[in-house]
Amino acid sequence: MTTRYIFVTGGVVSSLGKGIAAASLAAILEARGLNVTIMKLDPYINVDPGTMSPTQHGEVFVTEDGAETDLDLGHYERFIRTKMNRRNNFTTGRIYEEVLRKERRGDYLGATIQVIPHITNAIKEKVIAGGEGHDVAIVEIGGTVGDIESLPFLESIRQLGVELGRDRTLFMHLTLVPFLGAAGEVKTKPTQHSVKELRSIGIAPDVLICRGDRAIPANERAKISLFCNVEERAVISLKDVDSIYKIPALLRSQGLDDLVVKRFGLECREADLSEWENVIYQEANPNGEVVIGMVGKYIELPDAYKSVNEALKHAGLKNRVSVSIKYIDSQTVEAKGDEVLQGLDGILVPGGFGERGVEGKILAAKYARENELPYFGICLGMQVALIEFARNVAGMTDAHSTEFNKATPFPVVGLITEWVDEEGNVEQRHEASDLGGTMRLGAQLCHLLEGSKAAQAYKGNTCVERHRHRYEVNNKYRERLEQAGLVFSGLSSDRKLVEMIELKDHPWFVAGQFHPEFTSTPRDGHPLFEGFVAAASAHQKRDLKK
């Protein structure tokens, strides 16, 4: 199969939405019957985002094969059916690490290792490998044109443009076209300078995606075409919209997919965007609203919980309600108690690391349990629910996780001491082990208890979900917790590890050690999130009857 490559760059400012634009184009091409994948090339020196602060970088998205990747890969999976893997995201740090490892082995036969050709060749090899087996591979370059960090990546795709030729490569550049209220018009000069910067390193854009808070007038598009040497039909206006799921249709209406298909000489059907039209209709026509309290520690940056936010919205679509997310700092719960949890239709405690705010999450789980409020715990959210139950129902006062209190008399949650690395090797872990790459990661089979809420949600006795954690339920206390009434509704493939818990005599109190948000999509939703939002809606109706 001959793969065509679309390289997506950004200019003027960061956060223009390259990932959304790339994913939206991929969605249209997929709707035309093409097999599409998307890659993200990140210019930072970290080997992966696994140890980066969520409040700086946003969430870490985990792929099925256990790669810790940029949150943009979450957008990719929500827009197209293709599942991402570790080949879809790599960083400057990863490239340098691999090149230096080869140098130490002597693979370069004593050559002087340089950015060109050794680093650029390594980048090109990864891009080609990531695109294999697909009709089209869209490659997003992180950062902004002009950044020092991005230069090796830009040089690499410039070389690929020459080596593969125009019939297999296309360069798409996102820029900002701001509107100045004082002048009463949009300004194209930033775009002109951004394209000039891109052309100075040897890349001539074939398509310009012009971002702004309004549509770009036809005369300004003609001006951009003239000064940037891009044909007018390839100057695409991408205005702000109230839903990112409207963007595929917006790009389709301007013929972007036709331009791509013609450029690559591909024969395929017209795009069928009916699934996206249905998503947009559901989003615009809810029959009610539920308020979900998300109790976490990274709430100052909602992108830290990006996939959870989106999964709740998807569940709202399936239940025909809009979901309003109330972000609650778990430390505020510690300071003010139950009062900050009033007026909610459900509580969700997402994943996280570290001791700060953990008692607030435990209090949130207790409030939900005692007040029959729907509760959904994810990863740490499951662990705090189990700790709360152990303390206040099972009689294990001061029960805790060894992550937060190594001297706890009841370590109901403990460190996983053995794991398999990305190369399949069994490694031993201890408290002093590296933080990066030393977690239980990726898709794992889970056996579900027949008759449980989990089994009802999944409509079966098994599920496969993605993990990212280094602490697990301590099996030593399983029997005592079960005797106190806790239901272990999900177990690992070997039935040795607890994957899900729930409460029997509660309207909906379900928690999982995995991260179901990573597999939720706007078209398909996710069974656990759908069940949670349905329970929240039912709770609201019960409250209204009282």
UniProtKB/Swiss-Prot annotation:
Keyword Cell inner membrane annotated: no
Residues where ATP binds: 15-20, 72, 239-241
UniProt binding sites for L-glutamine: 352, 380-383, 403, 470
Gene Ontology MF annotations: ATP binding; CTP synthase activity; glutaminase activity; identical protein binding; metal ion binding
Entry binding sites for CTP: 14, 147-149, 187-192, 223
Coiled-coil residue spans: none
Gene Ontology biological-process entries: 'de novo' CTP biosynthetic process; pyrimidine nucleobase biosynthetic process
Enzyme class: ligase
InterPro entries (alphabetical): Class_I_gatase-like, CTP_synthase, CTP_synthase_N, GATASE, GATase1_CTP_Synthase, P-loop_NTPase
Regulation of its function: Allosterically activated by GTP, when glutamine is the substrate; GTP has no effect on the reaction when ammonia is the substrate. The allosteric effector GTP functions by stabilizing the protein conformation that binds the tetrahedral intermediate(s) formed during glutamine hydrolysis. Inhibited by the product CTP, via allosteric rather than competitive inhibition.
Assembly and binders: Homotetramer.
Name the record gives this protein: CTP synthase
Gene name of this polypeptide: pyrG
